[in-house]
């Protein structure tokens, strides 16, 4: 996925997001520039910083979805945060550096999963071996009565390995391992030892606790206090899953995982900063605006490049791509502090959705809403079909309600479709084998009264 061209990235985004070509092009170019930067000599590589993007547009038009799909495409660490969750240093709330710690945690989880996948087969074989030893344990050792035998215990053990009984034990275990692998014993019960989940410590440091300082007392004390183990009775299938995870954990080098996670967060990380318009000052210098300005000033050093301390080590934010988004109904991008405006040089405006866009959203994307409902009801044996005129009617109604009430973009389609299919979803278990066709009349019967009554539509749709 490294060397995708901007055109290929836009084509991929087209499968899931309708319209918004300008925004798609902007993120595609930003992504390609990352690839280009990696090909440069080291002295130039450090000089080139990512061009952060500011997306301006109403809710439900695809701002978050573009960033989320992009991160999924390139398998990059991605974190979405709301700017309103953060507070200025000295106020109760989350510290802005928390977004970088979240990014590193996401990156660590991704790298760990990749490493575990690489050792999965080996871990599985070790788990099968361990499970066979639990199910057919070694015979209990005899009590040593003669003190001299204590000095020659090693000789006794070696002698035991050449004992015919030992060969018999190994043969039985190999047979058992074969049955475990073939799944013959999946529902058998077995008792295994598992580590107890650590109970969270009492939080004394307010919101965010000591995590905000990049410390974790449980990790510090982990080496001093051995983990407690408890016995659990589970099926062989479940035991195999637990033991495979334990064995995989032993096979991977966590120091290497942490180093790679930090590097990936620094080089490929994407932070999606939503609701940035809500922290824009509207001209007042008192009340909540004071704190808003403080949050902007706190975000500034992170966006322009600084070092954030995390429990896995220091993380440089110089090459992390920041995508900010906001509706800017009550404020303008120029209401942000000038320094922060300058850190988002690429600005793209996302357009409000038209009736035609709504219709495409219902059918074109790979995860289109109508396809989801067809598949959901197919599990109950109901064959659901949407006619062309029904899709036009749903799109028209979604647009009308958005214009009349609050404009929530494509999310309005979910509300309307739920209302249209409410009775059908309820009765589906008793309709096995039936075909239901949703046409214009069906949609109008369910919704026309609600849509045309502005008071009703405000509460129901």
Curated annotation (Swiss-Prot):
Localization of this protein: Cytoplasm
Record-linked InterPro entries: AAA+_ATPase (IPR003593), ATP-dep_Clp_protease_ClpX (IPR050052), ATPase_AAA_core (IPR003959), Clp_ATPase_C (IPR019489), HslU (IPR004491), P-loop_NTPase (IPR027417)
Residues the entry annotates as binding ATP: 18, 60-65, 274, 339, 411
Pfam families: AAA (PF00004), AAA_2 (PF07724)
Alphabetic keyword roster: ATP-binding, Chaperone, Cytoplasm, Nucleotide-binding, Stress response
SUPFAM superfamilies cross-referenced by the UniProt entry: P-loop containing nucleoside triphosphate hydrolases
GO annotation, biological process: protein unfolding; proteolysis involved in protein catabolic process
GO molecular function: ATP binding; ATP hydrolysis activity; peptidase activity; proteasome-activating activity
One GO cellular component term noted in the UniProt record for this chain: HslUV protease complex
Predominant location: cytoplasm
Keyword Chaperone: yes
Presence of the UniProt keyword Acyltransferase in the record: no
Family: Belongs to the ClpX chaperone family. HslU subfamily.
Assembly information from the UniProt record: A double ring-shaped homohexamer of HslV is capped on each side by a ring-shaped HslU homohexamer. The assembly of the HslU/HslV complex is dependent on binding of ATP.
HAMAP family reported for this sequence: HslU
Function: ATPase subunit of a proteasome-like degradation complex; this subunit has chaperone activity. The binding of ATP and its subsequent hydrolysis by HslU are essential for unfolding of protein substrates subsequently hydrolyzed by HslV. HslU recognizes the N-terminal part of its protein substrates and unfolds these before they are guided to HslV for hydrolysis.
Protein name: ATP-dependent protease ATPase subunit HslU
Originating species: Carboxydothermus hydrogenoformans (strain ATCC BAA-161 / DSM 6008 / Z-2901)
Lineage: Bacteria, Bacillati, Bacillota, Clostridia, Thermoanaerobacterales
Gene transcribed to yield this protein: hslU
């Amino acid at each position: 996925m490294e060397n995708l061209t901007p055109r290929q990235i836009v084509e991929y985004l087209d499968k899931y997001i309708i319209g918004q070509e300008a925004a798609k092009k902007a993120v595609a170019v930003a992504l390609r520039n990352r690839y280009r930067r990696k090909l440069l000599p080291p002295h130039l590589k450090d000089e080139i910083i990512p061009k952060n993007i500011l997306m301006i547009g109403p809710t439900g038009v695809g701002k978050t979805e573009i960033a989320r799909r992009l991160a999924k495409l390139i398998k990059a660490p991605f974190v979405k945060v709301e700017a309103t969750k953060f507070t200025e240093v000295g106020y109760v709330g989350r510290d802005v550096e928390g977004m970088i710690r979240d990014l590193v945690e996401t990156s660590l989880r991704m790298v760990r999963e990749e490493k575990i996948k690489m050792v999965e087969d080996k871990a599985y074989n070790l788990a099968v071996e361990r499970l066979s030893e639990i199910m057919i344990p070694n015979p209990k050792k005899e009590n040593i009565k003669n003190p001299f035998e204590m000095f020659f215990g090693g000789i006794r053990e070696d002698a035991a390995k050449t004992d015919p009984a030992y060969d018999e034990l190994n043969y039985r275990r190999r047979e058992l391992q074969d049955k475990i692998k073939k799944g013959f014993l999946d529902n058998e019960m077995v008792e295994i030892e598992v580590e107890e989940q650590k109970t969270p410590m009492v939080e004394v440091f307010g919101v965010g606790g000591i995590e905000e300082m990049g410390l974790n007392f449980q990790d510090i004390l982990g080496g001093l206090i051995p983990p407690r183990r408890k016995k659990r009775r589970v099926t062989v299938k479940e035991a195999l899953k637990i033991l495979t995870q334990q064995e995989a954990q032993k096979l991977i080098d966590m120091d290497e995982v942490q180093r790679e996670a930090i590097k990936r967060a620094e080089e490929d990380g994407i932070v999606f900063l939503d609701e940035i318009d809500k922290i824009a000052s509207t001209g007042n210098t008192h009340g909540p605006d004071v704190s808003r300005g403080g949050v902007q000033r706190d975000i500034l050093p992170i966006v322009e490049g600084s070092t954030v301390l995390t429990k896995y080590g220091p993380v440089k934010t110089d090459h992390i791509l920041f995508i900010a988004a906001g509706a800017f109904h009550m404020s303008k991008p120029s209401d942000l502090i000038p320094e922060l405006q300058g850190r988002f040089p690429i600005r793209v405006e996302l357009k409000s959705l038209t009736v035609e866009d709504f219709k495409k959203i219902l059918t074109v994307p790979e995860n289109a809403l109508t396809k989801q409902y067809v598949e959901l009801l197919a599990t109950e044996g109901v064959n659901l079909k949407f006619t062309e005129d029904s899709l036009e009617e749903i799109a028209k109604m979604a647009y009308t309600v958005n214009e009349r009430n609050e404009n929530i973009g494509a999310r309005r389609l979910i509300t309307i479709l739920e209302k249209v299919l409410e009775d059908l979803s309820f009765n589906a278990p008793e309709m096995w084998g039936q075909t239901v066709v949703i046409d214009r009349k069906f949609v109008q019967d369910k919704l026309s009264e609600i849509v045309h009554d502005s008071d009703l539509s405000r509460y129901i749709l």
